[in-house]
């Protein structure tokens, strides 16, 4: 009624006055709304600096220097962490593109925001390439490329197929499995997968280091998991996917294969593929696949089974998995990452990528043989893939101590439990992988030298092991203060740097 009682001219004046009043109020309130505990120091940029257009080197030298130092560390050292790699300049271009600016909750053709024409094109292209790389029929397989990394991808699958407090079964972490496969200890549930789902681990044989499939089948029939996981993070042999399939079918479970570590080798057609036998396949995209840090979830479509009467049961995984990813666990996807994955997948379709995969395997076998020549024991006796697990227990050196010494010598690896280890807190070995250095151009003869460097580092650890104290804390304190030790490690580090510096490193030149 108020609007009807006043003229349009009067109303316009009132609204204009209100805007002035509100503007003045907001200006005053704006200075009072934020009351920090300590005064905030504001930086005034010089007139020739543009916050939105200048490069990071000019805008933020502090961050730039840290990135530059990390690049230098990667260049001068030997990256042997099995889950790491060097992605390409083209992938980095995609990660730094305008794709990072866009919000796009939902899926192609069904978004909760506008302006997604090219976002949809990119996601569809990424999905198309993902199926093509692994030789999958789009009528029988689909793929979700929105998961932010491997752990959320696995959790999304459990959420979709198992439900709260449902049962999953994966390889025990100390035996070569992964945290997301349901790891827990007697004291606590370490992973969210063991917190929200019931999990029962299967094991490897303590003597051979190989998965005990007979025991796995026996326990699966007792536990009756909803999802059986065929996946590893430190297992150097091929998985028997056909046996996994038979066990899963017998137990009434879905078979989920986690090929995060080996997906690049599967893409190159060099090792057995899990797709023939699996209902769901998950993978990260940044390990042997050599893409950005992301993940993919592949799921079957079409007919799941046919009973004795010829009645078909269809898969219903697509809706469940997509809904678990969004809106179940995530909001908007990282579109720059999806672009990077698409680029990496195109590279997977090249002959160069196959040659890279072949070299990974050659280098792994070369490193294994070199270390055995130096007298080291390897879990399972060798390797069929990109990694090997060195058992240091026979020489009396803990994995954490070897990792520390090698790190000081610019050789990056990680401590790892070995089959039969009593405590996961004091692992008896180190895990080594060849993808990263293979991406830098290392060949067999180079990995022989790498094996020699590792041997030197471990022998230094062995030399000072007894006098350096009983705990890792004591050991690190000793290595930080003993001058003779520091001199020996510095000499080794210098030779490692000189050797590593001969090889190119992919990506940006400076950072």
UniProtKB/Swiss-Prot annotation:
GO molecular-function terms, A-Z: glycine hydroxymethyltransferase activity; pyridoxal phosphate binding
Keyword Ribonucleoprotein carried by entry: no
Pathway: One-carbon metabolism; tetrahydrofolate interconversion
Requisite cofactors: pyridoxal 5'-phosphate
GO cellular component, one term: nucleus
InterPro entries: PyrdxlP-dep_Trfase, PyrdxlP-dep_Trfase_major, PyrdxlP-dep_Trfase_small, Ser_HO-MeTrfase, Ser_HO-MeTrfase-like, Ser_HO-MeTrfase_PLP_BS, SHMT-like_dom
PROSITE patterns according to UniProt: SHMT (PS00096)
CDD domains named among the record's database cross-references: SHMT (cd00378)
Catalytic activities: (6R)-5,10-methylene-5,6,7,8-tetrahydrofolate + glycine + H2O = (6S)-5,6,7,8-tetrahydrofolate + L-serine
Family: Belongs to the SHMT family.
Role, per record: Interconversion of serine and glycine.
Record text on subunit structure and interactions: Homotetramer.
Name this polypeptide is given: Serine hydroxymethyltransferase
Lineage: Eukaryota, Metazoa, Ecdysozoa, Nematoda, Chromadorea
